[in-house]
């Protein structure tokens, strides 16, 4: 009996979608001033590098953003809905408790059958989802997977907390992964440390028809910074070692777009020149699970990321979770 040839997962297309409403730092400062909260463009840029963010209008849902990003990724990949045999949505802001946001996206796209589910790993979510889809494709359980990161984080922000409300935006990014004979995704590592849950969390829950606990995002910024740069540095080196490449071989580093300070510090630790780091946090702010696919899509469409190049994508977020995916484009 002939042995079945190993299949690999390769990125065939990408897409991104941002809400139409753009809120600059000056816009946000003016809005917060009506609440007697003081901030400014200079204060936000100096600490985060963020200059603006996109915010969804009331009534716009995560599944709607995800669907638009998915359609653009499918167009880019040249695939039809009936070719999609897996949909994974990474989100911490689902439309419903259930069904999954992925099921809603499947219905919106007119896709049928195939595994369809959500992954919740906050800002690491897209890397978790991509690794999951890669495993299914390698195992021969899927051939064409739609992997999406989508969030409306503006719905879980405390707009009276200057330390967090200026950091986040809404949006969605997606990739199509297709089975291929040659490796696209070379290696992936996922990790978590549940003892660090309280440094970044939204602890509310639904019970008996009411939201109980604190429904808003809370963050210990200094603890998150320290954890993020430590684990991402180690994860990058581990995933490169598994793939048999050096960090210097990476053409593009696409980390989770949390804060420009984290991005710059990580680049220095890895000795990756800043011109080889894709940075979109200035325009998008932190879009949680959407940040990595949005950044990848921007860099593919503006011509920076080219076929054949080596790209390292990294996520880090609440849980505390982190992970890396190394891919040949």
From Swiss-Prot:
<comment type="similarity">
    <text>Belongs to the thiolase-like superfamily. FabH family.</text>
</comment>
<dbReference type="Pfam" id="PF08545">
    <property type="entry name" value="ACP_syn_III"/>
</dbReference>
<dbReference type="GO" id="GO:0033818">
    <property type="term" value="F:beta-ketoacyl-acyl-carrier-protein synthase III activity"/>
</dbReference>
<keyword id="KW-0012">Acyltransferase</keyword>
<keyword id="KW-0511">Multifunctional enzyme</keyword>
<keyword id="KW-0275">Fatty acid biosynthesis</keyword>
<dbReference type="InterPro" id="IPR013747">
    <property type="entry name" value="ACP_syn_III_C"/>
</dbReference>
<dbReference type="Pfam" id="PF08541">
    <property type="entry name" value="ACP_syn_III_C"/>
</dbReference>
<comment type="function">
    <text>Catalyzes the condensation reaction of fatty acid synthesis by the addition to an acyl acceptor of two carbons from malonyl-ACP. Catalyzes the first condensation reaction which initiates fatty acid synthesis and may therefore play a role in governing the total rate of fatty acid production. Possesses both acetoacetyl-ACP synthase and acetyl transacylase activities. Its substrate specificity determines the biosynthesis of branched-chain and/or straight-chain of fatty acids.</text>
</comment>
<feature type="active site">
    <location>
        <position position="123"/>
    </location>
</feature>
<dbReference type="GO" id="GO:0005737">
    <property type="term" value="C:cytoplasm"/>
</dbReference>
<feature type="active site">
    <location>
        <position position="286"/>
    </location>
</feature>
<keyword id="KW-0444">Lipid biosynthesis</keyword>
<dbReference type="InterPro" id="IPR013751">
    <property type="entry name" value="ACP_syn_III_N"/>
</dbReference>
<dbReference type="InterPro" id="IPR016039">
    <property type="entry name" value="Thiolase-like"/>
</dbReference>
<comment type="pathway">
    <text>Lipid metabolism; fatty acid biosynthesis.</text>
</comment>
<comment type="subunit">
    <text>Homodimer.</text>
</comment>
<protein>
    <recommendedName>
        <fullName>Beta-ketoacyl-[acyl-carrier-protein] synthase III</fullName>
        <ecNumber>2.3.1.180</ecNumber>
    </recommendedName>
</protein>
<keyword id="KW-0276">Fatty acid metabolism</keyword>
<feature type="active site">
    <location>
        <position position="256"/>
    </location>
</feature>
<dbReference type="GO" id="GO:0004315">
    <property type="term" value="F:3-oxoacyl-[acyl-carrier-protein] synthase activity"/>
</dbReference>
<keyword id="KW-0808">Transferase</keyword>
<keyword id="KW-0963">Cytoplasm</keyword>
<feature type="region of interest" description="ACP-binding">
    <location>
        <begin position="257"/>
        <end position="261"/>
    </location>
</feature>
<dbReference type="InterPro" id="IPR004655">
    <property type="entry name" value="FabH"/>
</dbReference>
<dbReference type="GO" id="GO:0006633">
    <property type="term" value="P:fatty acid biosynthetic process"/>
</dbReference>
<keyword id="KW-0443">Lipid metabolism</keyword>
<dbReference type="GO" id="GO:0044550">
    <property type="term" value="P:secondary metabolite biosynthetic process"/>
</dbReference>
